[in-house]
Amino acid sequence: MGSNTSKVGAGAEKQQVYTPLTQIDFSQSLVSQLDSSKESDYVTKQNAEKFIEKKVSQRLSNLEVETLKKFEDTLNNSLLSDDDKDAVDGISSSSLNNQIESLNKKLTLFDQLELQKLEKYGGAKGKSDKKTDNGSISIKAKLTECLLANKGKPLNCYEEMEEFKKLVMG
């Protein structure tokens, strides 16, 4: 389709000359300078590409600096302040840390109370030992042995697991 129009035959090359309406005179020095110029089209093209690459890299570096600045500003604005005075709605990182510490203290106290209750009623102490009063192996030990015996295989410890659940729940 378009290939016939874009091909030029060997003998069909024509040189067209346009004559301007006004007379253009170039000085002899300009013509000799253009003739003696060592830059070819290839060199000119390479220089133009280098210039464009330089401008693009400058623009990219400017954009990178602007983007990083915007990101840092956004990040700094989104972080909670350390001071209680600057905090918005009473929330600051120091107040949140204090709340977390108080909750951790309450949890440890709760865990200690639960352990004391279990020890008081004999639930955890008597049943977690290796052997119970009648000499049979404890449920925890049975479950541990079953898990170790079936290491890397599908587990067949359903009964031991159910007994352990009963022990823990109750």
From Swiss-Prot:
<keyword id="KW-0496">Mitochondrion</keyword>
<dbReference type="GO" id="GO:0061617">
    <property type="term" value="C:MICOS complex"/>
</dbReference>
<dbReference type="GO" id="GO:0044284">
    <property type="term" value="C:mitochondrial crista junction"/>
</dbReference>
<comment type="function">
    <text>Component of the MICOS complex, a large protein complex of the mitochondrial inner membrane that plays crucial roles in the maintenance of crista junctions, inner membrane architecture, and formation of contact sites to the outer membrane.</text>
</comment>
<dbReference type="GO" id="GO:0005743">
    <property type="term" value="C:mitochondrial inner membrane"/>
</dbReference>
<dbReference type="InterPro" id="IPR012471">
    <property type="entry name" value="DUF1690"/>
</dbReference>
<dbReference type="GO" id="GO:0005737">
    <property type="term" value="C:cytoplasm"/>
</dbReference>
<keyword id="KW-0472">Membrane</keyword>
<comment type="subunit">
    <text>Component of the mitochondrial contact site and cristae organizing system (MICOS) complex, composed of at least MIC10, MIC12, MIC19, MIC26, MIC27 and MIC60. This complex was also known under the names MINOS or MitOS complex.</text>
</comment>
<comment type="similarity">
    <text>Belongs to the MICOS complex subunit Mic19 family.</text>
</comment>
<dbReference type="GO" id="GO:0005739">
    <property type="term" value="C:mitochondrion"/>
</dbReference>
<protein>
    <recommendedName>
        <fullName>MICOS complex subunit MIC19</fullName>
    </recommendedName>
</protein>
<keyword id="KW-0999">Mitochondrion inner membrane</keyword>
<dbReference type="Pfam" id="PF07956">
    <property type="entry name" value="DUF1690"/>
</dbReference>
<dbReference type="GO" id="GO:0042407">
    <property type="term" value="P:cristae formation"/>
</dbReference>
